[in-house]
Amino acid sequence: MVPPTAVNDAPAAGSAVSVKDPAKDTILTPRFYTTDFEAMAAMDLRPNEAELEAICEEFRKDYNRHHFVRNDEFEGAADKLDPETRRVFVEFLEQSCTSEFSGFLLYKELSRRIKTRNPLLAECFAHMARDEARHAGFLNKSMSDFGLQLDLGFLTANKSYTFFQPKFIFYATYLSEKIGYWRYITIFRHLEKNPDSKIFPIFNFFENWCQDENRHGDFFDALMKAQPNTVRGFRARLWCRFFLLAVFATMYVRDVARKEFYEALGLDARDYDRLVIDKTNETTARVFPVVLDVKNPKFYAGLENLVTNNAALDAVDASASSAPIKVLRKLPHWIANGAQMASLFLMAPVRSESFQPSVR
């Protein structure tokens, strides 16, 4: 497996590539995770071992081994973008590269730490680390077309790592992979119908790319079924609702805040996110015992309140006020966000067996 930092990123002759400072950490930026490796090593896979072995066999085939090969379309493509489109597209590349690299680090460390005690699980994580490394390297190479690159080694050493228990890793990464599938395939299908909106050739790779995300999500689906306590019982239902809400709300607020990127692709950020949320919610019903009632008008009304509060927080950040004054000015918006998230969490969920009986 080639780590992202080892991808051939040499700039063309006569060009200069600068190392881009990492984006400031906020609640909306991609997180780096670590977990209880001892608990992962001791995990009993027997309740669903056959399905996990079948998924591992799919990983071994490495369908996209020869997919991520740049072609002549990339030559000069960056020069065709106007300054504002360049700005929002580079931001998209940075966020996506950071997210993929975060997955690589987690999966690679898991595969290394549990290899001797849980070889099947370790092999699955090694294959997924391979995919994430490939994605991150491809994105970082595209950044070099704009004269910038992320120092992935620096990110490894200096990013803050959030500790999650294994079951929380399962919820978060399952949703991340499945929502990634729906995000990529939705953009690909839109641009297939509207080729004039394809601002950069990287989008040509999204159809096969999203299948990696889908297979990774299927792996975590099977892994949760091998650990029935993660998807059964009252507490499991609460955690499933919490992670669904956290992932959907974060994506919606972030995407509306950078709606200019989606406009450059001929998409409306809100419509795009609603479609992705609907599809991800439906897919999640295959494993989670409950899903969110995203058809309830109160759901998106609540997300819009979060968007408004987030915009107000950004305005405070951009002001010339002193740090203590900024905290005081932010306090009511933080409280409003907390109250709104609590209200959304307390909305009645939809039981998965009634929501999607055909797949259960």
From Swiss-Prot:
<dbReference type="GO" id="GO:0036068">
    <property type="term" value="P:light-independent chlorophyll biosynthetic process"/>
</dbReference>
<keyword id="KW-0602">Photosynthesis</keyword>
<protein>
    <recommendedName>
        <fullName>Magnesium-protoporphyrin IX monomethyl ester [oxidative] cyclase</fullName>
        <ecNumber>1.14.13.81</ecNumber>
    </recommendedName>
</protein>
<comment type="function">
    <text>Catalyzes the formation of the isocyclic ring in chlorophyll biosynthesis. Mediates the cyclase reaction, which results in the formation of divinylprotochlorophyllide (Pchlide) characteristic of all chlorophylls from magnesium-protoporphyrin IX 13-monomethyl ester (MgPMME).</text>
</comment>
<keyword id="KW-0479">Metal-binding</keyword>
<dbReference type="GO" id="GO:0005506">
    <property type="term" value="F:iron ion binding"/>
</dbReference>
<keyword id="KW-0408">Iron</keyword>
<dbReference type="InterPro" id="IPR008434">
    <property type="entry name" value="AcsF"/>
</dbReference>
<dbReference type="GO" id="GO:0048529">
    <property type="term" value="F:magnesium-protoporphyrin IX monomethyl ester (oxidative) cyclase activity"/>
</dbReference>
<dbReference type="InterPro" id="IPR009078">
    <property type="entry name" value="Ferritin-like_SF"/>
</dbReference>
<dbReference type="InterPro" id="IPR003251">
    <property type="entry name" value="Rr_diiron-bd_dom"/>
</dbReference>
<dbReference type="GO" id="GO:0015979">
    <property type="term" value="P:photosynthesis"/>
</dbReference>
<keyword id="KW-0149">Chlorophyll biosynthesis</keyword>
<comment type="similarity">
    <text>Belongs to the AcsF family.</text>
</comment>
<dbReference type="Pfam" id="PF02915">
    <property type="entry name" value="Rubrerythrin"/>
</dbReference>
<comment type="pathway">
    <text>Porphyrin-containing compound metabolism; chlorophyll biosynthesis (light-independent).</text>
</comment>
<keyword id="KW-0521">NADP</keyword>
<keyword id="KW-0560">Oxidoreductase</keyword>
